[in-house]
Amino acid sequence: MSVVMLVFRVLLLIALVGNSAIGLSLMPFIAPPDPDWTPDDYYYSYEQSSPDKDASVTQTSPENPDWYYEDDDPCQSNPCEHGGDCIIRGNTFSCSCPAPFSGSRCQTVQNKCKDNPCVQGDCLITQTPPYYRCACKYPYTGPDCSKVLPVCRPNPCQNGGVCSRHRRRSRFSCACPDQYKGRFCEIGPDDCYVGDGYSYRGKVSRTVNQNPCLYWNSHLLLQENYNMFMEDAETHGIADHNFCRNPDGDHKPWCFVKVNSEKVKWEYCNVEVCPESDAANPVGSLQEPVMELPGFDSCGKTEMTEHAVKRIYGGFKSTAGKHPWQVSLQTSLPLTTSMPQGHFCGGSLIHPCWVLTAAHCTDMSTKHLKVVLGDQDLKKTESHEQTFRVEKILKYSQYNERDEIPHNDIALLKLKPVGGHCALESKYVKTVCLPSDPFPSGTECHISGWGVTETGEGSRQLLDAKVKLIANALCNSRQLYDHTIDDSMICAGNLQKPGSDTCQGDSGGPLTCEKDGTYYVYGIVSWGQECGKKPGVYTQVTKFLNWIKTTMHKEAGL
């Protein structure tokens, strides 16, 4: 099957009706492509229900399938950054920002170092009063780095190093014991990096040109993309220090250095690659084996507040970090004349090295596939994204299509480690749990995706909505799918508000259901009919639990 024909058949549309979502399979033909299409050429069309009607939630029943409700609140996604409080003001909002942040969304860090209060040191921005501190150059000390300590008293050399004074009172040197180095003998023999150094957490703070690194919260870095106040800084090992790091996936650790009083540049660091014998457990790196990583500490947990998690977004831009297990499958192949290469299917991260998706999304070579984790905006490369190649595709052996309907539509993607690791857990990248028991009909669940359609139209922003599970007996009724739903499938959606709609969601993406604050991937977006009128059809994950676990263990050699 050609790639173009494949894409015609794999992309599932989940209809947003009012603020609800149901599924649609592709027609056997495609509309003439728009040569001027860009990812921004889309719109949301939805009907608003009356406030009185939306204020109540009716009980579910086959006669009254009201499986969806909404809650419009400008603060529901907490648009305020850096811990700001969102305050509703009519139909809009304002942000109450904690110091030292300001701006309409608390996005700006106030520079408390403009008057250069540090005489012999670097002025650093902090989040506690007076919202700055001075990092003094040795042997200077004091709140403004103006006082000089007696050199070598006390001994600044670490790990048994011996301090020697020079003629100039501020000059000294450390004689380091064997295998230790650095200005203060602070760098040990195992301080090295593996791979590209993304996981490096050592203490080297000098560049290959022997320039000292700036602190990541230096006031000089406030306009840089990488600093202590960036999204997910801790995940990248960035904090109140000046140690070398590699947050952007360059080929080795680096840092910023000072050029003059106002200008900075970056340089690679003077840190060594670990010898092969030490590469498995470098002291300065996250210790994760390549072949099989242990799972994250927990699954199915977001770092959103409970209040925010339970709100409905229904077709609006999803909050970053609300679906941290959402995966974007992307290809280097052109999909259609109107759909450029890039995102074409969704998936769910169920283990640091494993992605769960639909089998019909995997009819191409691994060399043309990549997996992007933590993605929110398809047109931007965001700092918290993690990208991996696919090492292996494993489809369920009994996957097949009959009358253009996929059966047993499930596959696993084994990720190829980068720098000795697969996915690293962060606010934006987490695993979702596998369910152990079925969820009852009427359970409210979540769908998410970028809404890619067969003509290439879709949202650049991740969208989400809530739907409710529908009993297979009802979904198999003559008015719906007329006995085409088998026990490996589950339906979810809304039949209450047919009409003007925009479709969202991606084949292979997750249908997640929550229990006791934990999210489980209960379904995989598979197929559907009549966008906006019939429920979406999902692969029921509980039917394949044994295959999923057995496959992962077999590939790990367990």
From Swiss-Prot:
The active site is at H360, D409, S507. One of its GO terms (biological process) is proteolysis. GO terms for molecular function: calcium ion binding; peptidase activity; serine-type endopeptidase activity. It is found in: Secreted. Proteolytic cleavage at Gly-23 or Met-27 can give rise to the 50 kDa heavy chain (HC) and cleavage at Arg-311 or Lys-317 can give rise to the 27 kDa light chain (LC). The HC can undergo further proteolytic cleavage giving rise to a 26 kDa fragment. The LC can undergo further proteolytic cleavage at Arg-311 leading to a 17-kDa fragment and at Arg-478 leading to a 8-kDa fragment. Heterodimer; disulfide-linked. Heterodimer of a 50 kDa heavy and a 27 kDa light chain linked by a disulfide bond. This is Factor VII-activating protease. The lineage of its organism: Eukaryota, Metazoa, Chordata, Craniata, Vertebrata.
